[in-house]
């Protein structure tokens, strides 16, 4: 939904996903959309991919960090390696991406960094020990980026989604839920676009 929204609004969109297959459908459906296979948890791969994006599409005006890693379970159950991977995807990737995009945004005195998250960024819950800390760190990192880059023209915002997103697997998980129980991906995309341009 995010890719479709920004493409419809006239942006050339670079999409990043671990697997190429997830990107191909959107590339064939939309114009001015280019997919790049990359594991955002790998900083070397991410920097190389960002170089490709800049050479093919130019310097980004808006970054939406929507990747998510999760290791669910109690603090006694979670695998520390999977927890570290979730931290790399959720928090470290944001750090690396911000370092890559903000220099040109600051030079232009225009740009936006939007990060999607959820209420796990604000509170811990049972069985979220491998996820909530990574989202809290992500939110606090973005707040720090906002304080530092904001006065230089870069708008940074954390979009906390306190709802169940309407996806095939969530429909399956909540079979008896009514339509208005779910948050529509298009509504999230519209809000992210609005925030990026406020």
Predicted feature residues:
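The beta1-alpha1 cofactor-binding region of Rossmann-like NAD(H)/NADP(H)-dependent oxidoreductases
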Residues: 21, 37-48, 80
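Conserved NAD(P)H cofactor-binding loop of Rossmann-fold oxidoreductase domains
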Residues: 66-72
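Substrate-binding pocket helix/loop in short-chain dehydrogenase/reductase
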Residues: 74-75, 82-87
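Catalytic loop of short-chain dehydrogenase/reductase
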Residues: 112-137, 143, 147-150
